[in-house]
Amino acid sequence: MPLSDFPLRASVAVSDIDRAVTFYEGTLRLPVVRSGPSARIAGGSRVYRSGGDEALHVYQSTTAGSSQATVATWYVEDLDQVVDELTANGVDFLHYDGLTHDARGITARAGGGRIAWFADPDGNTFALESDG
């Protein structure tokens, strides 16, 4: 069977699961599906639902925040609304040199559409994209 027959879930390392829970469940309002151990840390991982399915696995690790690339992207219909809601919840959107962002951090996406980036407390970068 090809891998395309199976769901894919992003996994993100964090340095402090309690701080991550505050961010992912409180600030981003992602519903937790389950929690469990991570390596030798009881309760050191969470799986969150997004888009109607298990989509994001967050786990405590010493490698947290080491990626400088976007680790996961949400594809949204109304980028302005989602950015405004997350900003109201305390999310700061990133601005990158060489790109023209509006005041909220939204910029044109290569190939069309628009995109905005933000980071979790460990510096893991996420994107929001829309075609409009």
Named regions from a protein language model:
Residues 1-3, 74, 83-132:
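Vicinal oxygen chelate
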Residues 1-19, 69-72, 129-132:
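N-terminal beta-strand motif that seeds the catalytic metal site of vicinal oxygen chelate
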Residues 19-31:
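Amphipathic alpha-helical segments
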Residues 23, 79-85:
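Short amphipathic alpha-helices within nucleic acid-binding modules
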Residues 31-77, 94-95, 104, 125-130:
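Conserved short beta-strand elements that form part of the metal-binding/catalytic scaffold
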